[in-house]
Amino acid sequence: MTTLTRQDLNFGQVVADVLCEFLEVAVHLILYVREVYPVGIFQKRKKYNVPVQMSCHPELNQYIQDTLHCVKPLLEKNDVEKVVVVILDKEHRPVEKFVFEITQPPLLSISSDSLLSHVEQLLRAFILKISVCDAVLDHNPPGCTFTVLVHTREAATRNMEKIQVIKDFPWILADEQDVHMHDPRLIPLKTMTSDILKMQLYVEERAHKGS
């Protein structure tokens, strides 16, 4: 067993790669399960040894990839507190938030050969939870859209303009009015703890969604 800092072996990059791959699958699956887009644009794939639904719509896929490409430098520096998938109604008011709380320890005690296989087993459990989450959530109104929010640590927020990694895809400071839900219902879905990562997933659901 070896103790490493986050700087060793570009370890921040390894964790960021794992997280971005997982979040891409998770976002696609959330959009499918919560019926934000027609089921016809999704195709069944296999990720983490389980079947998942992934979009085959080029523009949607590009948006998700661009978003995570911008998140990746923040994950590498351990500057991300939460990644939030917000589902919005026709009036652009949030009806649901899928919140991924992420914690990365500064010191890592790991053996390299067991690292990824163990973490992927834990991430598989998240995917399975997302795939059945509609059983504990109310139906959403028709015509919903989505956006992705990133909650960063304070120091990172001051440097956001310096880490724009895709031209014409800038970070925009979220307006609290646009993302606030009054007294939402909180539904915990999954928690994981590993040597390289702690993550909690829960949903905040608006009490009255309309139709």
From Swiss-Prot:
Keywords: Cell cycle, Cell division, Chromosome, Cytoplasm, Cytoskeleton, Disease variant, DNA damage, DNA repair, Fanconi anemia, Mitosis, Nucleus, Transcription, Transcription regulation. GO terms for molecular function: JUN kinase binding; RNA polymerase II-specific DNA-binding transcription factor binding; transcription corepressor activity. Residues 21-155 are annotated as: Mediates interaction with REV1 and REV3L and homodimerization. Ubiquitously expressed. Residues 150-211 are annotated as: Mediates interaction with ipaB. The keyword DNA damage applies. It comes from the Eukaryota. Changing Y202A: Significantly prevents interaction with REV1; no effect on interaction with REV3L. It holds the Pfam family HORMA. PROSITE patterns: HORMA (PS50815). One of its GO terms (biological process) is positive regulation of isotype switching. One of its GO terms (cellular component) is chromatin. Residues 13-203 form the HORMA domain. Its main location: nucleus. InterPro entries: HORMA_dom, HORMA_dom_sf, Mad2-like. SUPFAM superfamilies: The spindle assembly checkpoint protein mad2. Changing L186A: Significantly prevents interaction with REV1; no effect on interaction with REV3L. It is found in: Nucleus; Cytoplasm, Cytoskeleton, Spindle; Cytoplasm; Chromosome. Adapter protein able to interact with different proteins and involved in different biological processes. Mediates the interaction between the error-prone DNA polymerase zeta catalytic subunit REV3L and the inserter polymerase REV1, thereby mediating the second polymerase switching in translesion DNA synthesis. Translesion DNA synthesis releases the replication blockade of replicative polymerases, stalled in presence of DNA lesions. Component of the shieldin complex, which plays an important role in repair of DNA double-stranded breaks (DSBs). It is linked to Fanconi anemia, complementation group V: A disorder affecting all bone marrow elements and resulting in anemia, leukopenia and thrombopenia. It is associated with cardiac, renal and limb malformations, dermal pigmentary changes, and a predisposition to the development of malignancies. At the cellular level it is associated with hypersensitivity to DNA-damaging agents, chromosomal instability (increased chromosome breakage) and defective DNA repair. PANTHER family: MITOTIC SPINDLE ASSEMBLY CHECKPOINT PROTEIN MAD2, MITOTIC SPINDLE ASSEMBLY CHECKPOINT PROTEIN MAD2B. Homooligomer. Heterodimer with REV3L. This dimer forms the minimal DNA polymerase zeta complex (Pol-zeta2), with REV3L bearing DNA polymerase catalytic activity, although its activity is very low in this context. Component of the tetrameric Pol-zeta complex (Pol-zeta4), which consists of REV3L, MAD2L2, POLD2 and POLD3; Pol-zeta4 is the fully active form of DNA polymerase zeta. Component of the shieldin complex, consisting of SHLD1, SHLD2, SHLD3 and MAD2L2/REV7. This is Mitotic spindle assembly checkpoint protein MAD2B. It comes from Homo sapiens (Human).
